[in-house]
Amino acid sequence: MRVRPRINRWTEARRNLVFSSSISKSLVQPHFVVSGKDIDEPISGMPGIQRQSIDVLLKTIAEDIKHGLSAHMLFTVVEPEHKDSVASAASDMDMHGIIAVREIKKHFGEQIVLFTDVCLCTATDHGHCGIIVDHQIDNDVTVQRLVEIAIAHA
């Protein structure tokens, strides 16, 4: 399956991200989403950045938009019990990361540009960014898995 989406210029947020001469319009705000409710936990190594549940994340993004930040990068924090060798959680439609994508799109639509992390390392039990076959990372299998994850996130 060939899926090669492009960053198009259909929305103002996308045009600003790609063509703006203003630095603030080109910034991408990182967000780390966790399961649960009312979670707003600071990340010690990243001052000003928190691990947040979806309910808190939606409020944070609304505030970011008020301050002119329209580009957002979503990283899903996967609990150890949901990790496996092929990063199943990364494309599980019932996992908080994908639910967050749906909620963000529903609440903010074309006001924002939303990026998601499709790297396998956060959802694999071995921590590598690829699918391991016979003790080696298999690039072809990994690319196919990344495509599946990207489609789930879209």
What are these regions (language model features)?
Residues 1-19:
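N-terminal amphipathic/basic leader segments beginning at the initiator methionine
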Residues 21-49, 115-137:
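N-terminal small/glycine-rich loop or linker at the start of catalytic domains
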Residues 26-30, 71-73, 111-115, 152:
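Structural preference for beta-strand elements that scaffold enzyme active sites
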Residues 40-52, 69-96, 123:
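Glycine-rich, proline-tolerant flexible connector loops at the mouths of alpha/beta enzymes
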Residues 62-66, 154:
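Non-catalytic positions within long, well-ordered alpha-helices that form the structural scaffold/packing
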Residues 84-118:
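Alpha-helix-loop-beta-strand connector modules within alpha/beta enzyme cores
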Residues 97-105, 135-147:
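Acidic, His- and aromatic-enriched active-site or binding-groove loops in soluble protein domains
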